[in-house]
């Protein structure tokens, strides 16, 4: 679950991290009043969406008058911002962040993720602030410096100083950087985060560090013990199909293709998407119905998949280990009858009672194509989309 920039900075403030004075506003009038609270300009106005690339898309602007603030708010509030990280529809702009402008001397990067290879929380710092860290990692990986947190000791001040020295910081900036490092690490661990970024972390012309931007991603599996983060959730920024799937404990991610995929198991789902691509198809989604694929969940999965108007065919790929394939077949038949599926449905069953399940599908009299293998399933669903 992602947070908005203004929400990230609210958390920064609670943990004593320096950030520009700012207010999230939902109307042009509130935006003007926020500027008055902040004081003399210039100010920075920022569209609040769960996506990067806002500046290049016109969603961030330095303004020198309240008239400009009102014009920016009137232009963006209630609209959708399209960036390179969104789809063609963009994300809705429901808040504008109004902040005091900062005199930027130099831009740095500081962030942390859970590194699966080392099984540690790893902090990354770079002198290449203001640039996507993925781009830095690809083009100039030697400019990224890392430290891993020991789960027994947690973050240590010497690690912050180590990163500061590698960034070429001196004097009071080393102390300020270490404080920010310790604060970010504390937020990451106490709030069960999966990602935290300050990009850019700015050295002002006055010689101080300030968190100019903030990006936080919470671990969805830990939200049950983070009630204040749950309250910050903005479902308007999420795909409604993904929200509906979460209510049924279905793992769904919307994509841009036209072949709906329903699979039990995340690994099998990724493999299914790969083989669909291999045979020239484009998956419309990732959908893992999990081990408890009941008729009700299969029905709901069909509803979610078919709510995407781009879907021209559905591929169901089930491996019967925990669940029996004949019960899955009953669920598929019931779901197709209830939902009224009007696109071709290709089903591949393998494992426990697979033959009985295939027989039930064949005897159902419905427009369900039984595949003999995963390759056969991919070929048939691609052919169905192409009208062959």
UniProtKB/Swiss-Prot annotation:
This is Succinate--CoA ligase [ADP-forming] subunit beta. NCBIfam families: PRK00696.1, sucCoAbeta. Signal peptide: none annotated. Pathway: Carbohydrate metabolism; tricarboxylic acid cycle; succinate from succinyl-CoA (ligase route): step 1/1. Substrate binds at residues 264, 321-323. Its cofactor is Mg(2+). Its EC number is 6.2.1.5. Belongs to the succinate/malate CoA ligase beta subunit family. The gene is sucC. Mg(2+) binds at residues 199, 213. It comes from Salmonella typhimurium (strain LT2 / SGSC1412 / ATCC 700720).
